[in-house]
Amino acid sequence: MFRGYIDESYNPHVFSLSCLLSTDKVWGEFSRAWRLTLNSLNRKLKAQGRQTISRYHAADSSNLKREFADWTTDEQRAFFGDILKIFRRYPIDTVALSIDLDEFHRIIPEAQTQAKPDFQTFLYGMTTKFLIERIADRRCSKDPNARIALVHDRSANDSVMFEAFSQQVNDPNFAFGHCFTTFVSTGWERCIPLQPTDLVAYENFKDSMRRVTPRDRRKSLEMLIDLDSFGGRSQVMDAKAITELRAGLLAAGAIASASEDKPGTDGTFPTK
């Protein structure tokens, strides 16, 4: 059984949805190593009379905020080095999808104004379906008998993501629906794998942001990618892909005009 943990990272310009995949056995060992690393760090912090941390949170660690506010950059890098040692020991696969929202709004403006109940709900539903397709391409196309359970970091969009999952795996045109068993949401407090998933989601998001604000790739992501145990595929839905999506919607008669454009809550536009 494979288990995939899903988390998102976004701003007004880019939306990224990432999934970390491995076997239940690997996740059990990975979680134990992660817990030991966190406990060891907290013992040191407590001995120094400093605030302990409840979890690894990528954005806070990267920006030295909240529980990481009194850290130095050397401490930050040392802790990331300890985390990297865990990734080095256990094989983890990542599948990620990012959308250039500036291009999306420019090419398909109808989605922003007419998605029901709002564009964010539409976005979560659509990207959930796209992510499942990409997980299937990477895992199920090689092993049609694979079984994959998905776990998402709890959010206000749980219900729309579950609905999108259900529609995708029950779609008769989706050849690998049988590979996906469950889609559940939980919090990081009860699920250690959501912490490394948060890390990778943040790194994928920051890498996708290079399209908006050109800069060198982050060293932290380079170090992850260089690990033999860390593999995967990250895609950006750019202007070309969004234009193709719009063409498909137009061909289906889904966005013939603003008055007729009525996308659903699950990330799809109804056909007519």
What do the predicted segments below correspond to?
Residues 1-4, 8-272:
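Phosphate-ester processing/binding pockets and catalytic centers
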